[in-house]
Amino acid sequence: MKNRLVLLLLPLVFALQWAVPLMQVVRGEGILREGVALRLELQPVDPLDVLRGRYLALAFPEEEKEHTLPPGVQGGDTIYVVLEAGKDGLAHITRLSRSMQDGAFAYTIPDRYKAGDTITINIPLTRYYLPEEDAVKIDELFRFRNNESPHSNATLGVRIKDGQIVAESLWLDGQPYRDWLRNYQSKPATSP
């Protein structure tokens, strides 16, 4: 009897093991397909994760700005951070809301804050993975040299839907990074 029960439950356990990651993939694809498209300015670096490969550790200048928490919220509450494209074409945090809106991602207020306090918002994207070959080329071309600033402006294309934000694409100098690599490599080298 015990063995029969195990044999009956085993397929259910296997199905659940596949269902959870599959649901996450489907949700992410839905956000990429139907979400609000915006671009955020980046402060990139290109570290290496031995187990996962090359990625950009994402840091956003927008995270350094302070915002006032709306009335009626306290630590532990979920608010919605509204991103809108500015005149520069980049996404900026325009307001914090207690209700979900288009172009807003969910953010949980740390416990030590209450309504009226000023807070900095951490955008919940920390890494953008790249194919190894592309990452090495970008690292060589984009790196700081002799205390110079980077040679390109980097932005991250994101999609937002139902309070979730996902990374979609990396842009360098206003173009998708693969186009930028192709164009940058086709330019003749300048002599010193």
Predicted regions and their residues:
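Extracytoplasmic/periplasmic terminal helices and flexible tails
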Residues: 82, 91-96, 107-192
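Cell-surface/extracellular proteins and modules involved
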Residues: 6, 55, 59, 64, ...
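Aromatic-capped interface at the extracytoplasmic side
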Residues: 18-40
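A mature extracytoplasmic/lumenal domain signature
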Residues: 44, 54, 62, 85-87, ...
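Short, Lys/Arg- and Gly-enriched loop/turn segments at beta-strand edges
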Residues: 50-51, 64-75, 89-94, 165-167
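Extracytoplasmic
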Residues: 35-37, 55-57, 76-78, 88, ...
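Short extracytoplasmic
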Residues: 39-71
